[in-house]
Amino acid sequence: MLDLQVIRPDPFVELDGEVVARIDGEPLFAWADAATAAVEARIAAGDLVEEAVDDHDVRKHYSDGADLVEDVGASKRRFPEEVIPAVAAIMKPLVVRERCRLRRLRVR
């Protein structure tokens, strides 16, 4: 079985390869930490065996800042209030980069 987790640090927004903003991932991390703890408990109990771990970047592409602000607004993540107008005004494609961990688990 595969377990995909979002991991720290906070996701960041890139414009033409340069970081222009960070997204507060803490609300999502709190939820993800609870899910991770549940899986870790099953590993500790011997019900699951962790066979492989891969930490990697995931990139999500947006057509412009308004598209990104709308998507973040509908998620557990948040932009700091002071950066929303500047990000929403960007009329070029943006990329959000975040760290994820993929684990291969086996039922014992």
Stretches with model-predicted labels:
Residues 15-18, 34, 38, 67, ...:
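Exposed alpha-helical structural elements
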